[in-house]
Amino acid sequence: METFLFLFEMLGTIAFAASGAVLGVRKGLDVFGVCILGLTTACGGGMVRDVLLGNTPPAAFQNPTASAVAVVTSLIMFLSGVRHLLMGNQRRYDLFMLLMDSAGFGIFTVMGVRVAWNCVEAPSLYLLVFVGVLTGVGGGLLRDVMAGDMPYIFVKHIYACASLVGAVICGVLRQPAGEMTAMLVGAAAVFAIRCLSAHYRWNLPHPNA
C-alpha cells in the first residue's frame, strides 16, 4: 500500500507540476519563474491542507521528494524541444493542459480525503470532502493567481464540482471497498468529469451566458 501511495502521489505531482510549468512557459516566465509556478501548483494544495489540519510543518517541508520531482518536471517542460512541441499548436497545448490538470486534480483530491481521514478520529463526510476539494483545487488556484489569470475553478467546466463528486465517492467507498479502491474510483471520477465537461462544454450557470 505504501508503494502505491508513493507512486500515486508522484504521478499527481508530475501532472500538476507540468500544468503549472507549461502555463509559466506560455506566460513568458524565465526558468526560475517556471519552476516556482510548477512547484506551487504541485505542492500548494497540500500545504494549505496541512496547515488547516494542524500538520505543521507541511509534508512538503518534511520530505522534499515531491518538491524535487516538481522542480525536475518543470525543468523538463522548459526544455526547448518540449516548449516548441506544446506552444506550436493550440489544440495540443489545450489537450496537454486538460489531461495534466485533470490527473493531478483527481489524485490530489483523494489524497486530501485520505490525509483528513488519518488525521481526525471518526471524521465526518463533510470534513473529508472539504479537505479533499481544498487539496485538489488549492494548487491550481495558486497557479492561476500567480500567473495573473482568473482562477479556473470560478469560471470553467464545473471544475470544483468534479472534485466534490470524487471526494464524496472516495469518502463513501473507503470503508466498504477499501482505501485503494476508494482512491482509484474517486480519482477516476474526477478525471472523467473534468474531461467530459471540457469536451461537451458543461458549465455552471453564468450571468453573461
Stretches with model-predicted labels:
Residues 1-4, 51-61, 113-127, 172-182:
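Helix-coil boundary and interhelical linker segments in multi-pass alpha-helical membrane proteins
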